Amino acid sequence: MGTGDFICISMTGGAPWGFRLQGGKEEKQPLQVAKIRSQSKASDSGLCVGDEVVSINGNPCADLTYPEVIKLMESITDSLHLLIKRPTSGTSEALDSETENTNHQHLPHGGPMESTTLQIQHAAKTQGKDFLLASVQTSAPRTEDQGNAWGYAECTTEDQVSQMPGSQEGHLVEEVILRKKPEAGQPGHVVELQLSLSKERQRCTSDPIVTLLGNEKFKSPDPDWGTQHGRTVHINSIPAPEKADTSLTSGTTVQTSSGRELTVIQGRDPGGTGLPQVEVILDCSDRLKAEECRLQAGRGCVASPVEGGRSEAPPSLVSFAVSSEGTEQGEDQRSGKDQGRPHKHRARHARLRRSESLSEKQVKEAKSKCKSIALLLTDAPNPNSKGVLMFKKRRRRARKYTLVSYGTGELEREEEEEDQEAGDKDEISDLAFLGTSESEVDEELLSDVDDNTQVVNFDWDSGLVDIEKRLNRGDKMEMLPDTTGKGALMFAKRRERMEQFTAQNEEEKTGGLAGGGSDALQTDGLRTMTSYQRKEESVRMQSSVSESSFQMGRSLGSVPQQNGFSGVSETAGPQRMIPMNRTAKPFLGSVNQTAAPFSPTQSVTSPIPDFPAPPPYSAVSPPPEAFSRGISSPVAGPAQPPPWPQPAPWSQPAFYDSSEQIASRDERIAVPAKRTGILQEAKRRGTTKPMFTFKETKVSPNPELLSLLQNAEGKRGTGAGGDSGPEEDYLSLGAEACNFMQSSAKQKTPPPVAPKPAVKTSSSSQPVAPVSPVWSPGVAPAQGPAFSTTNPPNPPQVTAVSSIKIAQPTCPPARPASALNLAGPFKGPQAAVVSHNYTPKPSAPTPLVNAAPAGAGGPSNELPGMSGKGAQLFAKRQSRMEKYVVDSDTVQAHTVRAQSPTPSLPASWKYSSNVRAPPPVAYNPIHSPSYPLAAIKSQPPGAQASKTSKKKGKKPLNTLDVMKHQPYQLNASLFTFQPPDSKDGLPQKSTVKVSSVAPAMKQALPPRQADIGSPTNAKASSVYSVPAYTSQPNFFAEATSPVSASPVPVSVPTSPKQETTSTSYFVAPRPKFSAKKSGVTVQENWRSLSLPGRAAPPIMSAPPWLCQPAYSYSSKPTLEQEKANKRPTPWEAAAKSPLGLVDEAFRPRNIEESIVANVVSAARRKVFAGSQEDWKERLSFVPQTQKTSMSFSERREYNVPSPVNSHVSSHSLYSSQLPYVCYRKESRNDLKAMSMDTRSEYCLPLGGYDYNPHPRGWRHQP
């Protein structure tokens, strides 16, 4: 072609176009491109320097001057179409793309398309051809006009990127439709071609993209060709097959991804014009491709349903190049360009698109755009570009999670593609690692895993490796015929695990409870491991909670104590989820186990530790007789079920143990495991007893106690019921709520925790304030209703109790049960003993006033089966509060005496921060039985001192690091508030009966002298038989006087062990501290004391009445002395001392005090000079000797010299005392230790008979 190649270049987007023109008519030079800016639209479109511009947007440029051209260019705002003439040296290789692609499903459809119409007009006067360009949409069928003579050339472009079998480069797809429109009636034919043009070739326009040579005729036009333009497939230029016909050698063979070929061959058509032909070989498979090419090439042309076959055209050579800009802009710009082309063309295209609606146009445009974008992503020019990699990653993820097969991540290939791959492709074994994570590495590995690869699926969560072989068609998993993929495997595994766990749980439920303590430990470990797998189990367990609880109850009864838990060890393991008072454990089990008489109670008791019984302070307390009987008989029948209602199922460990068990990470994520630990426990507590874990025996609950637990009003009712209500209320608020319990409590009577001076007055004025001693609630809860239930029916022990019984049953004990319950809470025989001691006879009911205070105090001290951190903290804090709420008189009276937590030890030694830690048993003074009873609310003098110390308490706590975790305990230990009278009055051996005695004393208290004299009171004191050293009996008496003014008759177990228990209880009557102290002290006491009943003492802890100091009768003289000789409170002393010592608070203030201290010390040395046995006996009697001047309550205590009762009472009095007692027990014989004890005792300036030379700490525990 002598004139060169004509190229149509389209640019869109508006100026600047990026090229400069030169020449023009005035210069008599053709208009040429002088310069092209790099990376500009002109450069991208393939415009080259030196190209001659024939027309601009259809306006011929031959007659235009340069200014006119510039003006014309400036008028173009959107799209620029240039027809340029480029010299060429010959024919160029042809690139053509077939529009029909049977595998078009794999390729994105639609995309921006730009259509340009090139009209080639033959003019007689010119050898060249004029080209008119206009935008046209190619979506409309164009083959309708294929029969038109002399058509026009229409060039359509669209951006598409496809995955070429052997190509990494992106290709610009152009639909180039060449149509020649007739002019002046000249005949002609229309040739339509769809071309795929690579961007590289576009830029190198010197090498023409498409070369059409010769006449071609469409024999079989496809009327729907326009609708199939989306099927365009990208092609790669390849050399003509060697096996192709020789006629192909003169042309170029182009193979598309679908296996089609476009060949441009030199041939002769029938007219002999010597024009080339264009052939398209369709649907050539790998095997038949050569044959078909050969055959079709031999024929010279092939009927193409897409291309329309062969047609003739006037001889011409036209090369088309389309800019990339045009392809990017898409149809948006050509949709409105119809006005730019000749009217005849618009009319024609309007006719073609008449059937299209606007929505259809939009849909097609969107498709074309999407196709163009998708092609760019799937066959990007730079496959390593960030955008392409991201797209692939997202695509893999989408495939992985959009399949129906639970997310295997394997994309099922199309049948056609599989057929192709199955052809000549060798099978390749690839390993793709499919994990559960979403990491990029996993996704990369997952990318495009073919069906013929082996997929190794690692389920890292389950730790199992599942190998899934996927060959050509992808083998389905045998194990899961219906579903496939990682998800299916995960669910199958989960099913198996859940079945295993269910079977294990069933086995454990049926026979697991019979194991020993070691088994329990193992159970704990297993439970920890499988805590996250409890989902299904919890529901089932809830339904079976009652059953399991009964089973546990039986097992508890039968199982020997372990870890200090009697019979509970078996169930304790499963139940350990519920925090328990570890310190109290030994008391619970060992004491119960040791005391033969308590064995019946043991079975009940052991369940009690595990399942906190409802507040022992039930509305109805069993008769003291029953308690005494149960306690007195060492070999009692099997423990009766606790009278209180059984704890809610949540309190039972089994309930929690059978928790759901979730197997894998995915499962855990989908179904969060049940919360465990403190949070779970708190949730269980819910609204009922949030701070306490009440482990109830599986025995049928006592209807009365059950009503107390279930009825909030009943709990808040007068007497013990009040204890339960406030307890729950404040527990729900938290441990600190106990500080406000007294004020917030809605009890009709003041809570035992904070006996008011008025209460004290009432006690002194009304001998019959049979309200359970404030301490009794604490004691009773410690005991647990089990004892009350077991013992109440037995009136025989009333004799023992009778001594304790208060002669003034002014009013039936509103909740005497509180006292009984106090004894009941003790899990062991001691607990039973305590209950007996504290249980007032029905005949001598305690006044509601006492019961109410007891109830108030009970929450902290009286919680029956209270265990766990929450219960401990609450009890400790409440006791601390009570200590500070003591009547001012009582506090003062008791502050007068040395405030040593362990009377046996000197205050300095006891309070030394260093010393505190060493005594394992009495590490916490508050927990020790020696803990000053005066510290409890009952002491009026203690109240003042406690208030003072309360203000300063936090400082001393800071100073004393040892107790930093339990500052409140430390506070209690610092205050050995015990009126001298109560000290003297309480014999060491006084038994738990002291609780009864205290009420009796309080009844007589109004006339304190009379109380002392009253035989009943004396008898009660005997029952108390608190060790002489224990001033606490006095405190109990005092404390009892206001609240327990009407002493609750307490049956004291006659068994020596019971005595010991009661004694310990009596010794450590700290109603406020009973819960915490009893727990801690109990352990200590248990160690020091071999009594099995110690476990119970922790529950009994300090009976409120015991804890309360003797009232004014014993403390008045002390009060006066104390006022006269005011010494710093233990808190003040600790605050002043750099070491936190409180010696200053206990040192003699004057000569009188010094003399008294010396005398007391000497007396003690004499008393304790003998062996422990002698010493024990002396202790039991010494208080009597000293009690001559002591208060009636003290005298009563002394009156009960029975070593057994004394022992039990001392034991039960205050389990917390036991630790100290035990500790001192070793040093009791030691003069030095005794001197220390005396030091704490004598430091109190108690010249009066109220002074108790034998502190609790001195009491000897057998």
Curated annotation (Swiss-Prot):
Q: Does the keyword Cytoplasm apply?
A: yes
Nucleus among the record's keywords? yes
User: One biological-process term from Gene Ontology?
Assistant: positive regulation of cell migration
Name the domain of life: Eukaryota
PTM annotation: Phosphorylated by PKA, and by CaMK2 at multiple sites. Dephosphorylated by calcineurin at Ser-558 and Thr-605; abrogating interaction with YWHAB and impairing nuclear import.
Q: Ranges of Pro residues compositional bias? A: 609-625, 639-650
Q: Where is the composition biased (Basic and acidic residues)?
A: 331-341, 353-363
Q: Which residues carry this modification: Phosphothreonine?
A: 327, 605, 749
Compositional bias ranges of the Polar residues kind: 89-105, 246-260, 558-569, 592-606, 786-799
From the UniProt entry, list the residue stretches annotated as the region Interaction with ZYX.
Answer: 999-1018
Basic residues composition-biased segments: 342-352
Written domain comment of the UniProt record: The PPPY motif interacts with the WW domain 1 of BAG3.
| Name of the protein in its database record | Synaptopodin-2
